A protein has these predicted regions:
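Conserved beta-strand/loop block within the catalytic cores
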Residues: 77, 82-90, 181-187
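Solvent-exposed, flexible loop/coil residues
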Residues: 3, 9, 13, 24, ...
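Internal helix-loop-helix
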Residues: 53-54, 84-157, 161
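Extended, charge-enriched "interface" segments that sit outside catalytic cores
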Residues: 1-75, 79
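Glycine- and acidic
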Residues: 33-45, 69-74, 98-105, 120-126, ...
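Intrinsically disordered or highly flexible coil/loop and linker segments, enriched in small
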Residues: 14-18, 22, 57-69, 94-101, ...
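Glycine-rich, Trp-frequent "lid" loop and neighboring beta-strands that shape
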Residues: 109, 150-201
Length: 201
């Protein structure tokens, strides 16, 4: 029901985006829910966004005040989320809302980023803090793009099954602002390795 989402989902470029992401529907018949054509894909996306909206309206949104009140805390030397955060995560995992952009061969949904971003927006409406946790699944994009096949097979299915990832920023002047990170990586051709240069806490 969000006009901005509807605008993007019905944009004329969406058909080409879907064809490219679906590799002209090459997964059809090999994986459950792999679309056979553009109309089938759009039907799948609409269903997925409706499920996301239901989870937001019935679980994530109603839990948000309790999550804020309890907050994360230290328990036996480990940081724990608020109990309702685990309820939110469980609901998204059971609904299959993990590994959304990853290929089906790793257990992902192979969604275009447009659809994943729409789901992000829906979840953020209920609890922006939880959306930050849930959307850490997109950290796996880096491994998918730059990792080797062994790494992909070891880690991507875990994220698609609902294991959470993290983004750890430890520079003194960056805080949680990823854009402020000053660490530089340069390739040392002589030693055939990457050198990191920056200040860490």
């Amino acid at each position: 029901d969000v006009p901005e989402i509807k605008f993007h989902m019905e944009h004329p470029l969406m058909k080409r985006i879907v064809e490219l992401k679906e590799r002209n529907y090459a997964d059809y018949g090999q994986y459950d829910y792999a679309p056979k054509d553009y109309e089938d894909a759009q039907e799948n996306y609409d269903s997925l966004l409706e499920i996301t909206g239901d989870i937001n309206a019935n679980i994530i949104g109603p839990n948000s005040e309790d999550v804020d009140a309890e907050g994360p805390h230290c328990e036996n030397g480990r940081v724990r989320y608020a109990s309702k955060t685990y309820e939110n995560l469980d609901a998204t995992i059971k609904a299959g809302l993990c590994g959304m952009t990853m290929p089906r061969r790793y257990g992902g949904l192979n969604l275009p980023n447009v659809v994943y971003t729409a789901a992000n927006e829906i979840i953020a409406e209920g609890d922006a803090g939880f959306e930050n946790i849930w959307s850490l699944q997109d950290c796996i994009e880096t491994l998918y793009e730059f990792g080797d096949e062994d790494q992909r097979k070891r880690y991507i299915p875990r994220v698609c099954a609902g294991e959470t990832m993290s983004m750890d920023l430890t520079e003194p002047d960056a805080g949680s602002d990823l854009q402020s990170v000053m660490l530089k990586a340069t390739f040392d051709e002589k030693e055939n390795c990457w050198r990191l240069n920056g200040v860490k806490r």
